[in-house]
From Swiss-Prot:
SMART domains according to UniProt: Ribosomal_S15
Signal peptide: none
Gene Ontology terms describing biological process: translation
Record keywords, A-Z: Ribonucleoprotein, Ribosomal protein, RNA-binding, rRNA-binding
CDD domains tied to this protein: Ribosomal_S15p_S13e
Taxon lineage: Bacteria, Pseudomonadati, Myxococcota, Myxococcia, Myxococcales
Role, per record: One of the primary rRNA binding proteins, it binds directly to 16S rRNA where it helps nucleate assembly of the platform of the 30S subunit by binding and bridging several RNA helices of the 16S rRNA. Forms an intersubunit bridge (bridge B4) with the 23S rRNA of the 50S subunit in the ribosome.
Gene Ontology MF terms: rRNA binding; structural constituent of ribosome
Subunit description: Part of the 30S ribosomal subunit. Forms a bridge to the 50S subunit in the 70S ribosome, contacting the 23S rRNA.
Identification of the protein by name: Small ribosomal subunit protein uS15
Similarity comment: family membership: Belongs to the universal ribosomal protein uS15 family.
Top-level taxonomic group: Bacteria
Classification via SUPFAM superfamilies: S15/NS1 RNA-binding domain (SSF47060)
Source organism of the structure: Anaeromyxobacter dehalogenans (strain 2CP-C)
Any one of the GO CC terms: cytosolic small ribosomal subunit
Length: 89
């Protein structure tokens, strides 16, 4: 299931960098993290859903690439984001 529009808007409002920001790395990572969390819960009850598991792995890879990009352009924004989202060490 895709994210509900209201939840998506809430995440965009929380992580945006300027008024009309919807595509900054921070927003994209936040949206991907929400979808990853949803799918992780889904797999707790649907253990044999291998088709969706592949989609989850693609989302995790996409988030990893965005985080790597963010780390190369601005270390401070990267650290702030991972602290806010509660990912990484």
């Amino acid at each position: 299931m895709a994210l509900v529009q209201e939840k998506k808007q809430e995440l965009v409002q929380k992580y945006k960098r300027h008024e009309k920001d919807t595509g900054s790395p921070e927003v994209q990572v936040a949206l991907l993290s929400e979808r990853i969390a949803y799918l992780t819960e889904h797999f707790k009850t649907h253990k044999k859903d291998h088709h969706s598991r592949r989609g989850l792995l693609k989302l995790v890879g996409q988030r990893r690439r965005l985080l790597d990009y963010l780390r190369t352009i601005d270390q401070g924004r990267y650290k702030t984001l991972i602290d806010q989202l509660g990912i990484r060490k």
